[in-house]
C-alpha cells in the first residue's frame, strides 16, 4: 500500500506532509518552500501557474490570477459572503447555471473545485518527487465549520487532481493530532484557535490516554467560514486607498494593476507589523494623471492596524464562548491553548486569546505546518503506520428535515461525534397522502427557510390512509468524512428512497469526470512537452557537435559525405523548429547514418592528439626536472 499524504488546502497557503517512519515530515516544493501560496494563474499563452510563480506575475495579470478560492468552494453565488467578495476581488466571480459561485477566466467558466485541484496537483507532485513513486491517496483538511456542500466540493477537488480522498478531517483536529502525539502527558483538554487566511475555527478537544492509546475527542466546534487574514488585508488596503485619495484625489479602486500591487504591499506591511511598531508602504509610480506619475508613501503604525481590525479580532471571540458552552466547560478547564493559522502571529490576536483563556497560548506549534502534519498522522492511522491513536470528530451543525409548518426538526444535533446514524419516524399531514417530500436541512435556526438547504427527494407509493397513520422512518447517516446519507422508508409498504447529499453547491458526476479527464489530458500533454524539450536538446547538441567535427575534419572529409551531412544538418535544423518529436528523432537518425565517415575521421584525429600529448609529456620529463615537479603538483591539485 502506498503512502497516504496529508494536505492542508489553505485559503492563502497550502502545505503537504507525509509520515516518515514514526515522524511526520513537511515536504518542500520545487521552489524549496515548505508552504505553497494557494494562487493559480492562467497566462495569455495558455500556461497554468501554481504557487510562487503565479504570485510573482499577479501584478501584470490581476484578472486571471485566482486566490482565496477556498472562500468560494461549495457556495452559492447569491450568498452574502460571496457577494462581498464579488466587489473586492480583481478576478470575475459569476453565477453558474445551478446557482453556484463560479469564476470567469478568459471567457471560460470554471468551478472552484476545478481551480483548487491545481493546488492539490502541485501538492501531489511535491510528494511524488520526494517519494519517487506515484501518490494516489490523501487526507485533506477543511475548516471545522465547513458545511456538507463545502466538504463535498473539497472531495471533488481531490478527485479532479487525481487523488482518492481517504478522509476529510477538520483543521483544528489535525492541529491537535500534530500537537498531542509528541506530548507524553495524561488527559488534557485543549482549545485550538485556528485563524487562517479565509476561515476561522475554534475546537475544544479532549486528549485521553488509556494504556498508551491516545483518544482525540472533539467536544465542541464553532467558527466563521468567512473570517480570516484576507479580511485583515482588505481593511488595510481600504485605509491606504482612502489615504491616497485624500492626498492625491485619485481613487485607485478603478485600477486593477495598482490594486494588485497594493494588495501585496498591504500583506507585507501586516506581516512586518507583527514584529515592528511601524512600517512604510512605499509604492513608486503607483498610478499617473495629467500632471505626471504618482507615488504612494504612507506610514502605518501597529496601533493604526489594530484599530482597523479590532472588530474582526473581537468577532472571533464570540464563537469561543459558544464552543465552551457547548462542551459544558469553563475557561479554567482548558489546559492548553494552541494557535493555528498565519494570522495568529499578530500580537493583538495572541493578546485577545490570552485574555479570554487567562493563559498564554503555546508557541511550540508551527501555525503554518501543524494542520498538514496532523493530516499526515491521520493518513498514517489509516494505513496502520501510526498505532494507538483514535480520532473522534464531530459534526459542526445540526442536521434535520423540514416538517409541517415550515419547522426544522433536527435528527442529529451539532457537536455529535461522527460517524453516527439516527432514525426518527414521521407521518403524513393529509388524508390519503401518497407521497412525501423529504427536505434535508443543516443549521441551528427553528424556521426551515433560515437554514442551509442540502437537498430534497420524494418518497412515493404510500398506501392511502388517514393523516398521521402511515409510518415513515427517516434515517440520517454521517460517515467519517462528515458527509451525509439520508433514507426514507414507508414501514407499511416497504418502499424506500435514499440520497447522498451531493453538495447542492457542487458538481454533478459528469462534470467531475470531465474535469478529471481534462486534468489527465493536461498531465499527458505536460509529459509529452517535457519529452519534446529533451529530444530538442539532444538534437541541438548533435547539430552543434557535428558542425564542429565537419569544421575540424576539413579536407579529410570527402565532398560527397560533406554534402550529405550538410543536407542532413539542414533537415534536422528545420525539424527542431517544429513540435514533432518523432520527426526530430528521425532526422537525428539520418544525420548519424550519413556521418559514419566523419566519425572515423574524428576518432583518428582524437587518437593522434592523445599520442602527441603523450610524446610532449615524455620530452618535458627528460628536459627539466623542476618543471616536472610543478606539473605533478598541479595534477595533484586537480
From Swiss-Prot:
One of its GO terms (biological process) is DNA replication. Residues 603-620 have a biased composition (Low complexity). Autophosphorylated; GrpE inhibits the autophosphorylation. Induction: By stress conditions e.g. heat shock. InterPro entries: ATPase_NBD, Chaperone_DnaK, Heat_shock_70_CS, HSP70_C_sf, HSP70_peptide-bd_sf, Hsp_70_fam. Gene3D superfamilies: 1.20.1270.10, 3.30.420.40, Actin, Chain A, domain 4, Substrate Binding Domain Of DNAk, Chain A, domain 1. It comes from the Bacteria. The modification Phosphothreonine is found at residue 199. SUPFAM superfamilies: Actin-like ATPase domain, Heat shock protein 70kD (HSP70), C-terminal subdomain, Heat shock protein 70kD (HSP70), peptide-binding domain. GO terms for molecular function: ATP binding; ATP-dependent protein folding chaperone; unfolded protein binding. Belongs to the heat shock protein 70 family. NCBIfam families: PRK00290.1, PRK05183.1, prok_dnaK. Acts as a chaperone. This is Chaperone protein DnaK. The lineage of its organism: Bacteria, Pseudomonadati, Pseudomonadota, Gammaproteobacteria, Enterobacterales.
Amino acid at each position: 500500500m502506498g503512502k497516504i499524504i496529508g494536505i492542508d488546502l489553505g485559503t492563502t497557503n497550502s502545505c503537504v506532509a507525509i509520515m516518515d517512519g514514526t515522524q511526520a515530515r513537511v515536504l518542500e516544493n520545487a521552489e524549496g518552500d515548505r508552504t505553497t501560496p494557494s494562487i493559480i494563474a492562467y497566462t495569455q499563452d495558455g500556461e497554468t501557474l501554481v504557487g510562487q510563480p503565479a504570485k510573482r506575475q499577479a501584478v501584470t495579470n490581476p484578472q486571471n490570477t485566482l486566490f482565496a478560492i477556498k472562500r468560494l468552494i461549495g457556495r452559492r453565488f447569491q450568498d452574502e459572503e460571496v457577494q462581498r467578495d464579488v466587489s473586492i476581488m480583481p478576478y470575475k466571480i459569476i453565477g453558474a447555471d445551478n446557482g453556484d459561485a463560479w469564476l470567469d477566466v478568459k471567457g471560460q467558466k470554471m468551478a472552484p473545485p476545478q481551480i483548487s485541484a491545481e493546488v492539490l496537483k502541485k501538492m501531489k507532485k511535491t510528494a511524488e518527487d520526494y517519494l519517487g513513486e506515484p501518490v494516489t491517496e490523501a487526507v485533506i483538511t477543511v475548516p471545522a465549520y465547513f458545511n456538507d456542500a463545502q466538504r463535498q466540493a473539497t472531495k471533488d477537488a481531490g478527485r479532479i487532481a487525481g487523488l482518492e480522498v481517504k478522509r476529510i478531517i477538520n483543521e483544528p483536529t489535525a492541529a491537535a493530532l500534530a500537537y498531542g502525539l509528541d506530548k507524553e502527558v495524561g488527559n488534557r483538554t485543549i482549545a485550538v484557535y485556528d485563524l487562517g487566511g479565509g476561515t476561522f475555527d475554534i475546537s475544544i478537544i479532549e486528549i485521553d490516554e488509556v494504556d498508551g492509546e491516545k483518544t482525540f475527542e472533539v467536544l465542541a466546534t464553532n467558527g466563521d467560514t468567512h473570517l480570516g487574514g484576507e479580511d485583515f488585508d482588505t481593511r488595510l488596503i481600504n485605509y491606504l486607498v482612502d489615504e491616497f485619495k485624500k492626498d492625491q484625489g485619485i481613487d485607485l479602486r478603478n485600477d486593477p494593476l495598482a490594486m494588485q500591487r497594493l494588495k501585496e504591499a498591504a500583506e507585507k506591511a501586516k506581516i512586518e507589523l507583527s514584529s515592528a511598531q511601524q512600517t512604510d508602504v512605499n509604492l513608486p509610480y503607483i498610478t499617473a494623471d495629467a500632471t505626471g506619475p504618482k507615488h504612494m508613501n504612507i506610514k502605518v503604525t501597529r496601533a493604526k492596524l489594530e484599530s482597523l481590525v479590532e472588530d474582526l479580532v473581537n468577532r472571533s471571540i464570540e464563537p469561543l464562548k459558544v464552543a465552551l458552552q457547548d462542551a459544558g466547560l469553563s475557561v479554567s478547564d482548558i489546559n492548553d491553548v494552541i494557535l493555528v493559522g498565519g494570522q495568529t502571529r499578530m500580537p493583538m490576536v495572541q493578546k485577545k486569546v490570552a485574555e479570554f483563556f487567562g493563559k498564554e497560548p503555546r508557541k511550540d506549534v508551527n501555525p503554518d505546518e501543524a494542520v498538514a502534519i496532523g493530516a499526515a498522522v491521520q493518513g498514517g492511522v489509516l494505513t496502520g503506520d501510526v498505532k494507538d491513536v483514535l480520532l473522534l470528530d464531530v459534526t459542526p451543525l445540526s442536521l434535520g428535515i423540514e416538517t409541517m409548518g415550515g419547522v426544522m426538526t433536527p435528527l442529529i444535533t451539532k457537536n455529535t461525534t461522527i460517524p453516527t446514524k439516527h432514525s426518527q419516524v414521521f407521518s403524513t399531514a393529509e388524508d390519503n397522502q401518497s407521497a412525501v417530500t423529504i427536505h434535508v436541512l443543516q443549521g441551528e435556526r427553528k424556521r426551515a427557510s433560515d437554514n442551509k438547504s442540502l437537498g430534497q427527494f420524494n418518497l412515493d407509493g404510500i398506501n392511502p390512509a388517514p393523516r398521521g397513520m402511515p409510518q415513515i422512518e427517516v434515517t440520517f447517516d454521517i460517515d467519517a468524512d462528515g458527509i451525509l446519507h439520508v433514507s426514507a422508508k414507508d414501514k407499511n409498504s416497504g418502499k424506500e428512497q435514499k440520497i447522498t447529499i451531493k453538495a447542492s453547491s457542487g458538481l454533478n458526476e459528469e462534470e467531475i469526470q470531465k474535469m478529471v479527464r481534462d486534468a489527465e489530458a493536461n498531465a499527458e500533454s505536460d509529459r509529452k512537452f517535457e519529452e519534446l524539450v529533451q529530444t530538442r536538446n539532444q538534437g541541438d547538441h548533435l547539430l552543434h557537435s557535428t558542425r564542429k567535427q565537419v569544421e575540424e575534419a576539413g579536407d579529410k572529409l570527402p565532398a560527397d559525405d560533406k554534402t550529405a551531412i550538410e543536407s542532413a544538418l539542414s533537415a534536422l535544423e528545420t525539424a527542431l523548429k517544429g513540435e514533432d518529436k518523432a520527426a526530430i528523432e528521425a532526422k537525428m537518425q539520418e544525420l548519424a547514418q550519413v556521418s559514419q565517415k566523419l566519425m572515423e575521421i574524428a576518432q583518428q584525429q582524437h587518437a593522434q592528439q592523445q599520442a602527441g600529448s603523450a610524446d610532449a609529456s615524455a620530452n618535458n620529463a627528460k628536459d627539466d626536472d623542476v618543471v616536472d615537479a610543478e606539473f605533478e603538483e598541479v595534477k595533484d591539485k586537480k
